[in-house]
Curated annotation (Swiss-Prot):
Involved in the biosynthesis of carotenoids. Catalyzes the condensation of two molecules of geranylgeranyl diphosphate (GGPP) to give prephytoene diphosphate (PPPP) and the subsequent rearrangement of the cyclopropylcarbinyl intermediate to yield phytoene. The keyword Magnesium applies. ATP is required for the transferase activity but it does not seem to be hydrolyzed during the reaction. SUPFAM superfamilies: Terpenoid synthases (SSF48576). Residues 321-342 are annotated as: Disordered. The lineage of its organism: Bacteria, Bacillati, Actinomycetota, Actinomycetes, Kitasatosporales. Gene3D superfamilies: Farnesyl Diphosphate Synthase. Its EC number is 2.5.1.-. This is Phytoene synthase. Its cofactor is ATP; Mn(2+); Mg(2+). GO terms for molecular function: 15-cis-phytoene synthase activity; geranylgeranyl diphosphate synthase activity; metal ion binding; squalene synthase [NAD(P)H] activity. Pfam families: SQS_PSY. The keyword Transferase applies. GO terms for biological process: carotenoid biosynthetic process.
Length: 342
């Protein structure tokens, strides 16, 4: 976390600054696309975004970190401990864990609904016991907590030009779209963890099943039925992106370049998956560095342009107020009104 970002956000307590810095590190290490897009936000909003994503990454590590040997029971107890700390922190108690401290501070600053955090942890707990989903409807209930609430948490930080309730469905859809893309990109790794986030009904519609996916993963052999499933899942994912897209224009202008950049980069992962023949069971699809750089540069240009316009408008308002205050007033009466020639 840069000193400039923390100062701009009004975060001065040394322990709290260290907590936000910890969240920034988690986001930088685990979420390169999100981290890159976050740099396009105004500096005063970046710490809050890092706190939200840092918490999500930390909880996800408890569930999924294969480098840390732990039984499902140990992971479940760790999540329960995290939830207890979270509840205490949101009530105003000083949390021992820095990530919780930063998250609680962000939730208070932006009046974020606490249910979004408890819903998220509920979905994280289900990952310890649930390895698959029968339908998109069933998967959707899981994704409300694992993805949709992330978009809803972000709305107060990003700001909107419409009522927040109007923008909320699109923000939730974007969170879901991003996670559906993750599911497709990481389908092989998730299988290794004993999970498959492609509904059973989708597999059956194309003559496939979980056993076939596991066979292909273990042997490295392609299968046309698996390709058909993945192609259909990508089409579904694109439909969710389309549902989310109108929400970008509902955000505060200074936040749009960040979210548009994340939108383009993440939907670009689908393009990479398609270009690689849907071989996600055998290798990870990535957006080429040159493409990432071009998208980031476009986002930076947009961000600078928006901030320049906003700064000029603010300067014009300040100048108008200064002129009003300096205008001579008649004794005991209002300032004279300037009449324009007709």
């Amino acid at each position: 976390m840069t000193v400039h970002e923390l100062d701009a956000a009004g975060i001065h307590d040394p322990a709290l600054r260290a907590a936000y810095t910890r969240c920034r590190g988690l986001n930088a290490r685990h979420g390169k696309t999100y981290f890159l897009a976050t740099r396009l936000l105004p500096v005063d909003r970046r710490p809050a975004v890092h706190a939200l994503y840092g918490f999500a990454r930390w909880a996800d590590d408890i569930v999924d970190d294969l480098d840390t040997p732990a039984t499902p029971g140990e992971r479940a107890r760790a999540l329960l401990g995290l939830e207890a700390q979270l509840e205490a922190g949101l009530r105003g108690a000083r949390a021992a864990e820095p990530v919780i401290r930063a998250l609680a501070d962000t939730a208070a600053r932006y009046t974020i609904d606490h249910r979004h955090f408890t819903d998220f942890l509920s979905s994280m707990r289900s990952d310890l016991t649930v390895g698959g989903y029968a339908s998109y409807e069933e998967l959707g209930r899981y994704m409300h907590g694992s993805a949709a609430v992330i978009g809803l948490q972000m709305l107060p930080v990003l700001g909107t030009v419409v009522a927040r309730e109007e923008a909320a469905p699109h923000a939730a859809a974007l969170g879901v779209a991003f996670q559906l893309t993750n599911f497709l990109r990481d389908v092989g790794e998730d299988l290794d963890r004993g999970r498959l986030y492609l509904p059973t009904e989708l597999l059956a519609a194309h003559g496939a099943d979980r056993d076939r996916f596991e066979w292909s993963r273990s042997t490295g052999m392609p299968d046309s039925r698996i390709t058909d499933v993945l192609r259909a899942a990508a089409a579904h994912n694109r439909a969710v992106y389309r549902a989310a897209l109108p929400g970008i224009a509902m955000l505060a202008p200074v936040s749009r370049p960040c979210i548009r950049t994340a939108f383009v980069l993440y939907s670009g992962i689908l393009d990479a998956i398609e270009a690689d023949g849907y071989a996600v069971l055998h290798r990870r699809a990535v957006v080429p560095r040159r493409r990432r750089a071009a998208v980031a540069l476009d986002g930076l240009v947009r961000a600078v342009a928006v901030r320049t316009v906003c700064r000029r408008r603010a300067d014009a308002v300040d100048a108008s107020r200064s002129a009003e205050l300096s205008r001579p007033r008649t004794a005991g009466g209002p300032a004279p009104v300037r009449r324009e020639a007709v």
